[in-house]
Amino acid sequence: MTIEKNLSDVQQKYADQFQEDVVKSFQTGYGITPDTQIDAGALRREILDDQITMLTWTNEDLIFYRDISRRPAQSTVVKYDQYLRHGNVGHSRFVKEIGVAPVSDPNIRQKTVSMKYVSDTKNMSIASGLVNNIADPSQILTEDAIAVVAKTIEWASFYGDASLTSEVEGEGLEFDGLAKLIDKNNVINAKGNQLTEKHLNEAAVRIGKGFGTATDAYMPIGVHADFVNSILGRQMQLMQDNSGNVNTGYSVNGFYSSRGFIKLHGSTVMENELILDESLQPLPNAPQPAKVTATVETKQKGAFENEEDRAGLSYKVVVNSDDAQSAPSEEVTATVSNVDDGVKLSINVNAMYQQQPQFVSIYRQGKETGMYFLIKRVPVKDAQEDGTIVFVDKNETLPETADVFVGEMSPQVVHLFELLPMMKLPLAQINASITFAVLWYGALALRAPKKWARIKNVRYIAV
């Protein structure tokens, strides 16, 4: 005879818990901390895969840095000569039977290049190298420092600016890059359109008029992809592989210009530093954010030709010192009405912080991506008497666009001067850690500014 007894809800709860504890297996579970690794889980080894997955760029992405030649420097300032023009040609060289032509000398000028100093410092505890690691921490830090220095050299070779300083007669820490060194008459404005064969031919012609031959073109991969997309409708390739599968599409790695063949290089990292990363946390010694006001000024020789570009212009400003950068300023907006209007940004930097600001970076928001793109860097030495930095946006640099640099990639035209090739320098040890720096001293030299061209404001696939 079985006697059944009804249990209350509370009694049933405790009965169920008791039943679970009685029949519970010796399980390993998924816990990864001592508090959650119990029973069989306490016996489980922690397994870390020995492969490090790289989710950022590597040295293989630094195309320009790999291509450019290097020349040793013997001083912190290097001089070189530029043969600008021959003597007079034409009617003045014709003379009478017993005559001689008047003296006509060639035009030769000296140029100087100041060496700049690039460094990346790493620090690791002694204990971090003694434990059972999947990789050597010292090697990881060394490879990272080399990559950082190489990337810095490549970025400065495109966009470096030696004028970015607070000293009125001084010189900034960067060396001048191609964007500053290329002859101003060789700057082609694409006005927000995609790269076309016409642009490349125009660049080749301008370089040819400077007695150079365009051999290489460097651009973000988004520009290169957009260039290929523009050709897909006019040319098509259908290829069959060994398995009978039909593939379409192609990669355009070069262009036959009116002046010869130009190699096309698509870079994955070229424009990265031109996009504002708002996720970065300012360092403790970073300047305070700037205070910015925006007003519309008329008759500023602006170029707001597209009406869609005139409404809701949004700006943010970042203050840069030698070692750190501030958080972005609060967003300021403006709307222009006329083509020749300009947006006047009045920027006030706070003087009460640890380090002297050297320049401000001005960003404008793109309408499609919503990201902020660098349109100008202004040195603090250009501030007005009241300390205000004024910049007028005339729509000369468009957000969501990029640059294409085309030129003659030969050692006689462009190269890096190296006072100190890249080296690893152990630093003083003041505690139980190891500190070292990777150094490089040098600068970019563009000996023939007319043998390179810059195509600016090129539309591209920005992601």
Curated annotation (Swiss-Prot):
Residues excised as propeptide: 1-24
Lineage of the species this protein comes from: Viruses, Duplodnaviria, Heunggongvirae, Uroviricota, Caudoviricetes
Protein name: Major capsid protein
Alphabetically ordered keywords of this record: Capsid protein, Virion
Biological function: Assembles to form an icosahedral capsid.
Domain of life where this protein originates: Viruses
GO (cellular component) term, any one: viral capsid
Localization, UniProt: Virion
